[in-house]
């Protein structure tokens, strides 16, 4: 045979599921985008077209919605674990399941002063507004014996309006950038972190608390680091997470440097004391790195888009 089959997988991508949990008059929302990828004994469907080992992708879609009812959605990670375990243990030909989930965050809408007196609460218990552009993500991979859980976020935009410098860099005949001793530092964070929970015998992390605390440490490190380079800030963000979250062994960030350039106001007879900037959307510097707990091996892909 002149050709052979290489790596392959199949499943149903981007199953949008919204789960409403009703606690009396108070409602809670989980809004997920779930993608299922299955692999295993799938040679014949490629070579001969035999579907004998194929679980239809429509069935994987139906499973996502059924599990939202049967198991609920405590967290994106826990929901993905339920799905991955089911596909591997219930279908003999399937040896590995990879579940990717994006979670969209919602927060309650505050009631007006007059209405809060009427309903006896500061928030409307069934009304929500989508929170910014930040998206929570997770990927769960299960091969029947071990787990890999990589979680994170994307599109979290942050800015320091001072306490950032950039100087002392290499200069050649093409360098025009002026050294900066007080600049805006802004980025759109894409980050992933890998948990050291890999076995059912281990104690499972509290996924919701872990995400909340990891995000907190990441933002605090960004805010509290007097930055001489975005690389330095990135390293401090990852180190803060690993030093404070024992369940995480590896962090990877991709941070575009959202450049803000001082506008020359002298033609208008005005002085610009680091107050008026032009926000450039492209081109941008792109800073990427992995931070590891000492003694651990890197496993998060270098290109986060390949997760």
Label every PLM stretch briefly.
Residues 1-216, 220-307:
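N-terminal intrinsically disordered, cationic/polar leader segments
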